[in-house]
């Protein structure tokens, strides 16, 4: 039997001269606002995606114009930490070089810009570089932005975990100089044919995207089990001693294709802090060598582990790391939400967590969020920490500066909104009009949808109960909907699949309850379930656990068998 043909992206990567392609030539062309099909795949490794305004597609087609192309650029910000000075630079770019005039906090602790014309890409990347920021490897078949729990209470432990996250990000960056040459005008260095340009990735990089997170228990705001590779911090006497390693998580799937499914990571065991890089590289290189390069829908690490088996994968990782896993340590994983308002850290500094609905920082009628963040950045002496729930922490505030910071936040609408438990635990992806994959609305519709959920909870007397609700416009799962107690995944305009049964802590997936239904049906189903939950729930029982216990949906134990079955 002949070998299967590789996926097209594999040939593109091989022939790209380490991610250069013809990006430079495409950038210089003013004939079109787009890049060539091949370069559209390669620019992802540089941190951005080509998009167009789908609200205007038909109108422009009638006018015989090409789509209104623009680009979404995502920064690499390990652990979501940036300085006020950097934020002012980020804000200036958003205000002057993008059509969206906004900054979007993501579900992976970074920010992205929408509505960038091709002519502004280079200026933006050079502007980020002046602030010691970049977008390399924020997208593409590489290790993406490394998440780390911002944990503003245990400052010392957070600092130790953050250093690990930053080292992971730096160590696993692509070594190619394509980014520096194309965007920063650095000269191309001559290399010999046999020189190793990419010691970890090789010429074809990874089969697919690779996501990594560092969690600091008891918090699980990074949703560690949804990542390809996770490190759960283990502390003794307040000091970091190592991590429980998890591998094989991932949210993406394809509607109607049962061979694709979301999956939560497996626990592999405890590793010492000094061995983190060895194990990270080992897991990545096993995926590099064993991952599926013929079918991109089956190319994530989760499928590699399912197809080759847990024990075989674990043994190979240990061989490559040169270290054996120890038995995993007992840790408690709990809340995935953020602590809103003021929290005092162990160092006496204060941290203010701001709720940013769907992560969109923009000046709007009645709320000048972007102006407020700018004003705070001008006087703040600590740092900013973006969370994986799309929120912002004003971190490291001295006691004497609290009143000033809070005053600015309240004045500009960053503080003071009525925030229900459920709204504070809920996130949505961008979806329409810019995401080319979206089948339905998410960010634009989500606030209204949560209003309905809040009303139903109030009606049924369960407003005190936080429920994790997430919405995406497609099944790629950017807002991790399959790990939500209530997950809504776009199927068509105004229609969603409704998923129930994940647990509150993020250690069990949900399962489809109703397919392809509209708002009225969704709300009717949830109203009936909330009524039952109010009466039948056990003491302390969360909504997701309730739906499994009473048989509304079956628990997903083994995603490969249970998610669709």
Curated annotation (Swiss-Prot):
One of its GO terms (cellular component) is sulfite reductase complex (NADPH). Binds 1 siroheme per subunit. InterPro entries: CysI (IPR011786), NiRdtase/SiRdtase_haem-b_fer (IPR005117), Nit/Sulf_reduc_fer-like_dom_sf (IPR036136), NO2/SO3_Rdtase_4Fe4S_dom (IPR006067), NO2/SO3_Rdtase_4Fe4S_prot (IPR045169), NO2/SO3_Rdtase_4Fe4S_sf (IPR045854), NO2/SO3_Rdtase_FeS/sirohaem_BS (IPR006066). It comes from the Bacteria. PROSITE patterns: NIR_SIR. Alpha(8)-beta(8). The alpha component is a flavoprotein, the beta component is a hemoprotein. The gene is cysI. Belongs to the nitrite and sulfite reductase 4Fe-4S domain family. GO terms for molecular function: 4 iron, 4 sulfur cluster binding; heme binding; metal ion binding; NADP binding; sulfite reductase (NADPH) activity. Its cofactor is siroheme; [4Fe-4S] cluster. It is an enzyme of class 1 (oxidoreductase). One of its GO terms (biological process) is cysteine biosynthetic process. It catalyses: hydrogen sulfide + 3 NADP(+) + 3 H2O = sulfite + 3 NADPH + 4 H(+). Pathway: Sulfur metabolism; hydrogen sulfide biosynthesis; hydrogen sulfide from sulfite (NADPH route): step 1/1. Siroheme binds at residue 478. This is Sulfite reductase [NADPH] hemoprotein beta-component. [4Fe-4S] cluster binds at residues 429, 435, 474, 478. Its EC number is 1.8.1.2. SUPFAM superfamilies: Nitrite and sulphite reductase 4Fe-4S domain-like, Nitrite/Sulfite reductase N-terminal domain-like. Component of the sulfite reductase complex that catalyzes the 6-electron reduction of sulfite to sulfide. This is one of several activities required for the biosynthesis of L-cysteine from sulfate.
């Amino acid at each position: 039997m002949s070998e299967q043909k590789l996926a097209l992206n594999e040939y593109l990567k091989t022939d790209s001269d380490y991610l250069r392609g013809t990006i430079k030539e495409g950038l210089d062309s003013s004939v079109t606002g787009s890049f060539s099909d091949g370069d559209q795949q390669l620019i992802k490794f540089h941190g951005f995606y080509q998009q167009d305004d789908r609200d205007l597609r038909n109108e422009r087609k009638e006018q015989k114009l090409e789509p209104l192309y623009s680009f979404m650029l995502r920064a690499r910000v390990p652990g979501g930490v940036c300085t006020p000075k950097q934020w002012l630079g980020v804000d200036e770019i958003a205000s002057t070089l993008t059509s969206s005039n906004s900054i979007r906090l993501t579900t992976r602790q970074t920010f992205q810009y929408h509505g960038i014309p091709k002519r502004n890409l280079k200026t933006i990347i050079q502007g980020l570089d002046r602030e010691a920021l970049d977008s390399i490897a924020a997208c593409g078949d590489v290790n993406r932005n490394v998440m780390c729990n911002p944990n503003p209470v245990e400052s010392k432990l957070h600092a130790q975990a953050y250093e690990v996250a930053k080292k992971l990000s730096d160590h696993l960056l692509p070594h190619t100089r394509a980014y520096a040459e194309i965007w920063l005008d650095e000269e191309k260095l001559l290399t010999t044919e046999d020189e190793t340009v990419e010691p970890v990735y090789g010429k074809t990089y990874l089969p697919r995207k690779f996501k990594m997170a560092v969690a600091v228990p008891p918090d699980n705001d990074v949703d560690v089990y949804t990542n390809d590779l996770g490190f759960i911090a283990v502390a003794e006497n307040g000091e970091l001693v190592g991590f429980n390693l998890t591998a094989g998580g991932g949210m993406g799937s394809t509607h109607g294709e049962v061979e694709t499914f979301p999956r939560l990571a497996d626990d592999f065991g405890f590793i010492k802090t000094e061995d983190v890089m060895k194990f990270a590289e080992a897991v990545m290189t096993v995926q590099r060598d064993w991952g599926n390069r013929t079918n991109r829908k089956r190319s994530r690490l989760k499928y590699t582990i399912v197809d080759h088996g847990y024990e075989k994968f674990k043994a190979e990782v240990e061989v490559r790391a040169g270290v054996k896993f120890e038995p995993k340590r007992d840790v408690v994983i709990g809340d995935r939400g953020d602590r809103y308002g003021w929290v005092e850290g162990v160092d006496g500094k204060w941290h203010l967590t701001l709720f940013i609905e769907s992560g969109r920082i923009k000046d709007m009628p009645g709320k000048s969020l972007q102006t407020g963040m700018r004003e705070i950045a001008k006087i703040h002496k600590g740092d900013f920490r973006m969370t994986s729930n799309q929120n912002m922490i004003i971190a490291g505030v001295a006691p004497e500066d609290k009143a000033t910071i809070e005053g600015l936040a309240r004045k500009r609408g960053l503080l003071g909104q009525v925030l229900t438990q459920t709204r504070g635990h809920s996130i949505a992806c961008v979806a329409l009009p810019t995401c080319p994959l979206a089948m339905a609305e998410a960010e634009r519709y989500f606030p209204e949808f949560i209003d309905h959920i809040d009303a139903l909870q109030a009606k049924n007397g369960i407003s005190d109960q936080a429920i994790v609700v997430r919405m995406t416009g497609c099944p790629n799962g950017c807002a991790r909907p399959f790990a939500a107690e209530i997950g809504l995944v776009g199927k068509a305009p105004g229609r969603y699949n409704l998923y129930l049964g994940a647990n509150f802590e993020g250690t069990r997936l949900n399962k489809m309850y109703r397919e392809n239904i509209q708002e009225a049906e969704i709300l009717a189903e949830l109203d009936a379930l909330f009524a039952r939950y109010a009466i039948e729930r056990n003491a302390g029982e969360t909504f997701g656990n309730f739906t499994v216990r009473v048989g509304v949906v079956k628990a997903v134990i083994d995603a490969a068998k249970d998610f669709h079955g």
